[in-house]
Amino acid sequence: FVNKHLCGSHLVDALYLVCGDRGFFYTPMAXXELEDPQVGQADPGVVPEAGRLQPLALEMTLQXXGIVDQCCTSICTLYQLENYCN
């Protein structure tokens, strides 16, 4: 694994590779912190579950201060990715 910028589908693919059967997770920001208040009011069928792909816009909005900052904006290590595994 080479430390590099991982964004969008490349980031999700890397998480699947690193986490394998354990799956992965993220911690969304509180609804008041979201740019679009409608995002926090998604249908229960759209609520993210560990290791499931989400619509990219929702995923990027909810993760803006976490894994995206660590791995897309900055360069990410294998160990940083493992922090998001279940």
From Swiss-Prot:
Q: Which UniProt keywords apply?
A: Carbohydrate metabolism, Disulfide bond, Glucose metabolism, Hormone, Secreted
Which residues would be cut away as propeptide?
33-63
Tell me which stretches of the chain form a coiled coil.
Answer: none
Please provide one cellular component term from the Gene Ontology annotations of this protein. extracellular space
A Gene Ontology molecular function term for this protein is:
hormone activity
Compartments reported by the entry: Secreted
Write down the SUPFAM superfamilies for this protein, in alphabetical order.
Answer: Insulin-like (SSF56994)
According to its UniProt record, where is this protein mainly located?
Answer: secreted
**GO biological process terms, semicolon-separated:** cellular response to oxygen-containing compound; glucose homeostasis; glucose metabolic process; positive regulation of protein secretion
Q: What does this protein do?
A: Insulin decreases blood glucose concentration. It increases cell permeability to monosaccharides, amino acids and fatty acids. It accelerates glycolysis, the pentose phosphate cycle, and glycogen synthesis in liver.
Subunit structure as annotated in this protein's UniProt entry:
Heterodimer of a B chain and an A chain linked by two disulfide bonds.
Name by which UniProt lists this protein: Insulin
Q: What is the lineage of its organism?
A: Eukaryota, Metazoa, Chordata, Craniata, Vertebrata
